[in-house]
Amino acid sequence: YLVDFEEPDVFRYRIAGTEISETFGHGNLKGKTLSDILSPSGRDFVTNRWLPVIREGAIVCMKGQVYNSMNRYAFGERQLLPLADEPDGPITGLLGVTVSKWVERLGPVERRNSDMVMFPAAKVP
């Protein structure tokens, strides 16, 4: 998925794969913000996890529970990379890749946030 950033803290999908769109009950996420597809608490949670990409130029790697819905959840890995319109310009969005496997819920399951590691993209050789 490719997501544009708008100040102060809005993430808007430019493009997303079919599986991600269907996860959120939409045929197409183009132009949708996190507020359009998530509850207010879900939007705040994702925004806080994505903001280091924009504010710090961080590459973010996550592993564990990467999606959570009413009747199933997904475990896997996710990487978020900062994007800029110009080589030394401000970060204007992110590129995300998620690989996961869905598991059906058999009963109440406590949400466990995925583990997250960040490092500066500028440090990558």
Which stretches of residues belong to each language-model region?
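Signal-transducing coiled-coil/dimerization helices and immediately adjacent hinge/linker segments
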Residues: 116-125
